[in-house]
């Protein structure tokens, strides 16, 4: 059991641990590592994790993340967590391949690995995430129905991704494209915004200039950017996307987004910490993969999610 603790200015909490017994203070050290600390998606995940830690009373939880979505910076955060005495690392991998060697080294050092939201290639004890392929297909079907209901059966559609490596958003894109198979709609090549709202807005505006009638955002940043571009288009293009933040909900309420697929990051964080404690105690962890589900938020039900 590791006894040291990491004191870092950019960390917000405490930590998880790997072993059989708790540290001398009676707590297991758990590190939650997300892609950044900007998106409300990650804030809600930390809220859920902290709730579980407070309920259990034997978890020392630390939330750490790079300032931007970047593989090398996330690898550095993982290494800092290991050096700081992590027993368990809960991580949303920015890139499934890039981070895997660091996770392998962490595991070899005795750190237990749990994935939340976005897994890497290295095998973990458990993954708590959205079934992103299915959720992406649901987004596609929702948009397809909206267009068909308006008598629109063909046209160009743009897709804004985060990057080409993030497993979760790539799977959403694949599911979205599946929904439009065997239709007369043309789905253009995906453009990437690195989760940056301003960059996503520019991409969406370019799609509009290319004659797109709709645009799909695969995460919070790309969805906000898409919604802002739709607003500036005067409603000649429609948007649909992912995640639930105050800005996203406002865009839905005001009609710039016809719908968003709301994940449950708080559930991922909460159940991740519960899983970490069970792992430390040597208890059965159940299924290796848990789908934490999505809700479809539209203008009609948006107030229920505020």
Question: Predicted regions span which residues?
Answer:
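Hinge/cleft segment of the Venus flytrap/periplasmic-binding protein
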Residues: 24-27, 37, 156, 160-164, ...
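Hydrophobic alpha-helical
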Residues: 78-108, 176, 189, 193-251
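Short, low-complexity disordered leader/linker segments with a strong preference
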Residues: 1-29, 54, 82, 104-111, ...
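Extracytoplasmic "Venus flytrap"
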Residues: 28-48, 52, 56, 61-78, ...
């Amino acid at each position: 059991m590791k006894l040291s603790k990491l004191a870092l200015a950019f960390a917000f909490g405490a930590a998880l641990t790997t072993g059989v017994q708790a540290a001398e203070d009676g707590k297991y050290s758990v590190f939650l590592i997300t892609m950044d600390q900007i998106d409300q998606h990650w804030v809600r995940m930390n809220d859920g994790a902290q709730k579980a830690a407070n309920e259990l009373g034997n978890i020392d939880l630390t939330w750490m993340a790079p300032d931007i979505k970047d593989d090398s910076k996330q690898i550095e955060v993982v290494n800092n967590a290991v050096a700081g005495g992590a027993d368990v690392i809960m991580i949303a991998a920015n890139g499934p391949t890039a981070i895997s060697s660091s996770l392998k080294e962490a595991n070899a050092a005795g750190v237990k690995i749990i994935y939340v939201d976005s897994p890497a290639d290295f095998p973990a004890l458990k993954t708590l995430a959205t079934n992103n392929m299915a959720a992406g297909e649901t987004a596609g079907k929702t948009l397809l129905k909206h267009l068909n209901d308006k008598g629109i059966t063909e046209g160009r559609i743009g897709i804004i991704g985060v990057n080409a490596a993030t497993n979760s958003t790539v799977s959403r894109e694949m599911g979205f494209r599946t929904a439009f198979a065997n239709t007369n709609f043309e789905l253009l090549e995906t453009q990437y915004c690195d989760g940056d709202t301003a960059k996503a807005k520019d991409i969406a505006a370019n799609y509009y200039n290319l004659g797109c009638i709709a645009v799909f955002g695969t995460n919070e940043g790309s969805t906000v950017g898409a919604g802002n571009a739709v607003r500036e288009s005067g409603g000649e293009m429609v948007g649909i996307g992912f995640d639930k933040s105050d800005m996203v909900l406002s865009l839905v309420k005001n009609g710039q987004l016809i719908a968003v697929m709301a994940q449950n990051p708080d559930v991922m964080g909460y159940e991740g910490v519960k899983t970490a404690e069970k792992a430390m105690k040597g208890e059965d962890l159940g299924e290796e993969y848990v789908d934490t589900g999505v809700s479809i938020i539209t203008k009609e039900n948006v107030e229920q999610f505020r």
